[in-house]
């Protein structure tokens, strides 16, 4: 009884810490509301969170390598980081460099240069990260304050990793931005409660998981969480073919949202095939030969202009062609 109460108390304390951090970051981000709309500053904030997290992870790994230098470890070798699923962060992209420039009028250009450097050094992030931090509509003073606020949180600290802090902040911001954007926000975000129910209903222990309209990747994140809660880890070679061995496949038509998903999964170390480009599943199926074991999706409902007249003889309509004027049954 005492042990259960202690665990409950710890969960409550962690939940309080997580909410405190979420609200603090949101308050800082919300100061940008007057200079740009939610659709724009969403990428400003999420990009900074991404940059802070990979920089923290890099520095943690760097400290390990410095401690092991006498044993042959090389803290300047990018492969020493990539072998541990840590992104290599060049000096001009490290958070300490950004923080040192936060009060300068050129902070926007500094952040843009950091994003470019990260993409150059990490092939999996090529053309993924947001740019435009030096745009006139983003005041340098407000951007600098946001950098300061993000700096106060060690996104790679042990206690924050246990909280899945990055995931919580990312999901919280996606939800907040979706609310701010109204109906349009539903295009990239499905409420976490809905995602959790869908995943727990299907219980994807093993096999291929597919989302044909994956948005920002919430279904995949929750699938990983489900597997981990059952004591396994996605991508563990030792469990290939066993419970816990699942593969992720997805597709997204909106390029901006597709990049959000790639960032979301990259931060969590989830290996996924989201196609070589963003594409409409109806008219450019990038996984035509995929035999999925689980299909999880929250498709865009009540779309009338989906080009159904061009797909009347599509091979996928094995149970009858859907109405041309409504994609709900497609």
Show which residues each predicted segment covers.
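A residue-identity detector for tryptophan
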Residues: 26, 88, 95, 258, ...
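Glycine-rich S-adenosyl-L-methionine
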Residues: 315-330
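Hydrophobic alpha-helical scaffolding
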Residues: 11, 136, 159, 213, ...
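A short, mixed-charge helix-start or loop-turn motif at secondary-structure junctions
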Residues: 180, 243-244, 317-318
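Enriched - but not universal
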Residues: 29, 91, 98, 261, ...
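Conserved S-adenosyl-L-methionine
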Residues: 184-297, 302-313
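Gly-rich Lys/Arg/Thr-decorated short loops/hinges at beta-loop-alpha junctions or inter-strand turns
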Residues: 176-179, 311-316
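Non-catalytic, mostly N-terminal accessory regions of nucleic-acid modification and defense proteins
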Residues: 1-206, 273-286
């Amino acid at each position: 009884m005492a042990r259960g109460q202690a665990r409950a108390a710890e969960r409550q304390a962690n939940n309080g810490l997580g909410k405190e951090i979420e609200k603090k970051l949101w308050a800082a981000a919300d100061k940008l509301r007057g200079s740009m709309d939610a659709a724009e500053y969403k990428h400003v904030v999420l990009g900074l969170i991404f940059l802070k997290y990979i920089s923290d992870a890099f520095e943690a790994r760097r400290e390990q390598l410095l401690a092991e230098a006498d044993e042959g470890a090389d803290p300047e070798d990018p492969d020493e980081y990539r072998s541990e699923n840590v992104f290599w962060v060049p000096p001009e992209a490290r958070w300490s460099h950004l923080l040192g420039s936060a009060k300068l009028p050129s902070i926007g250009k500094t952040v843009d240069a950091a994003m470019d450097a990260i993409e150059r050094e990490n092939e999996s992030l090529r053309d993924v990260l947001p740019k435009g931090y030096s745009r006139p509509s983003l005041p340098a003073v407000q951007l600098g304050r946001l950098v300061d606020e993000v700096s106060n949180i060690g996104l790679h600290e042990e206690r924050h990793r246990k909280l899945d802090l990055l995931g919580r902040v990312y999901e919280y911001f996606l939800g907040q931005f979706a609310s701010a954007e109204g109906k349009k926000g539903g295009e990239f975000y499905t409420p976490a409660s809905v995602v959790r129910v869908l995943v727990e209903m299907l219980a994807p222990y093993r096999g291929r998981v597919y989302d044909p309209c994956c948005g920002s990747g919430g279904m995949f994140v929750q699938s990983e969480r489900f597997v981990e809660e059952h004591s396994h880890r996605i991508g563990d070679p030792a469990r290939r073919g066993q419970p816990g061995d699942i593969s992720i496949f997805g597709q997204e038509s909106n390029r901006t949202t597709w990049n959000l998903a790639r960032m979301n999964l990259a931060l969590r170390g989830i290996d996924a095939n989201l196609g070589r480009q963003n594409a409409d599943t109806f008219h450019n199926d990038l996984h035509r030969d995929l035999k999925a074991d689980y299909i999880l999706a929250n498709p865009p409902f009540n779309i009338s202009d989906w080009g159904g007249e061009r797909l009347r003889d599509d091979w996928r309509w094995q149970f009858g062609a859907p109405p041309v004027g409504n994609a709900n049954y497609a």
